[in-house]
Structures are given as structure tokens and as C-alpha cells.
UniProtKB/Swiss-Prot annotation:
One GO CC term, this protein: cytoplasm
SUPFAM superfamilies: Carbamate kinase-like (SSF53633)
Domain of life of the organism encoding this protein: Bacteria
Name the record gives this protein: Acetylglutamate kinase
Pfam family, one: AA_kinase
Keyword Cell membrane set for record: no
Coiled coil: none
Enzyme class: transferase
Main location: cytoplasm
InterPro entries: AceGlu_kinase-like_sf, AcgluKinase_fam, ArgB, Asp/Glu/Uridylate_kinase, Glu/AcGlu_kinase, NAGK-C
UniProt subcellular location: Cytoplasm
Gene3D superfamilies: Acetylglutamate kinase-like
NCBIfam families: argB
Amino acid sequence: MTRKNNALPKARTLIEALPWLTRHHGKTIVVKFGGNAMVNEELKGAFARPSFLVHHAGLRPVVVHGGGPQISAELDRYGLVSEFKAGLRVTTDEAMDVVRMVLAGQVQRDVWGCSIVHGPLAVGITGEDAHPISATRHRPLIDGEPVDIGRVGEVTRIDTGAVLALLEDGRIPVVSSIARAEDDGHVYNVNADTAAAALAAALGAETLMVLTDVEGLYEDWPNSDEVISRLTASELETLLPDLSSGMVPKMEGCLHAVRNGVRTARVIDGRVPHSILLEIFTDDGVGTMVVPDEPSVSEGTS
């Protein structure tokens, strides 16, 4: 193949990306980066490079991270038992000290560390810094009864001031999913999927992207590995009761986002090279995309 022909695929890629670059320029995207990906060095690098590329392409990325595996490992090291109820970690006062230490002192530093090689743009904050995330104690229902799971928070308010200030300064905010209560001052462990969705809605983000270690939302798991490529908010709401516990907070987050002003929410496989770029800048994309319901005829003509 000649040098000219070698360059043609690159030109086609740029042509395909151009309308998406134009559409997304100046828009905010919120990317939830899971703790599972942080234990894989290759995935960390694959996440950092595209994040900086979309920044330099004119988008405004905000990263929200979890740290489940790292928290579990540290709890084990301290001899504290990891217990889960309703898919959420039971967080005692002692466990909360570990959660704060791991999310703000270890995982966030890791995200920042793999990002800094691409430029001094990432700035780490938690839900305690200038209170971007406020929460109250969350009591999930199990068999119809509320259950106390300790210092686990339900988001009550998002203050976008600190995040917007960083974005206006050309930075990439990296947010740990810890929140402080407005009433009693307690600090809570907030599910990172939930925090990312609430932040995306408050920022009026163009899209919420949830990076995970599966291909997307499966149509009939475990009977089929067929991935649903696109569904509406109402279609997703119908599926929620039958989803696996691990997918529920991710898909609930997507549902909350698109019903509160976010144009699209996507669950994508972080193991796929350049998955963020493929989802944003190509016609096909990867993973599962959730979109708002189409307005009814009466809504459209009123």
C-alpha cells in the first residue's frame, strides 16, 4: 500500500469525527470512572489519554470516581468486615474513616497521577471541599422496610460553584464521591454512579458516561450477551426491577440524568481501547445509550 493510501483511513476518521466535534464543542461531559478500572494499569492509561484529548478538542470533562475494590482491600487490612445490603456497602463510623482515606488519599491521587503525564490540568476535590455534594443518611427499603446501613448518603443538593470555577480555568475536576450533610455535619459515603448522575444534571451536561467492565446493558442476561444499544427513559424504567444489583445504580443514574436535562447517558466498556472517543466522536459508538422520552403530541403542540 502506498503512503497516500495509508493516510486515507485517517482522513475518513477525521471526517467522521468533524460533525461530532462541532456538536460537542464547549459542552460539559461527566465521566464516572469506577474503582475496578483503577486496579488495572492499562485501563488507567487508556482512560487518562482520551480524557485529555476531549479536553483539548474543546469539551469540558468532569471525572467522578469510585473505589470499591480499594476500599474493600483497606477494610480487610484493618480487620473490618465488608458487608453489603441492597447493593450498597454498610458503612460504620470506623469504615467511613477508611472510605475517606482511600477515596481522597489513594484513588483520587491515582487518577491524578495517571493524568498529570498528559498535562497539569486535573484537580482533585471531594464532596467536602466547598461542599459540591451534600447528602443525608440513606435508608434503603428491604422487603418493604427501611434499613440502616450506616454512613451511606443520599444526595440532597449539588453546588456546582467549585466545579464550574475549575472548568472556567481550563481544568479537569476529579471528584471523589464523599458528601457532607447540611444539617448534622456528618460525612457520608455516596455511590459514585449516583453522585456522577446528580452532578451531570446540575451542570446541565451534554452527556453522562459511566465506564464499567461490561459491554453495556445486556438484553437478557445471563441467557444472552446481546447488548442494548439505545433505549428511552421509559423503556429503561420498565427494565430496572429485573436488573442485576451491580447494574441498578448505574442505570438509575442514567435515568435520573436524562430526566433532569442531560441529553444522553451512556454505559460503556472501559476495557475497550479509546471507548470514550468512540462513543463521542463516531457514528456507531459503543455500549448502551439512554435518551429522554420523545415529547407527546400534546406536549409538542401546547
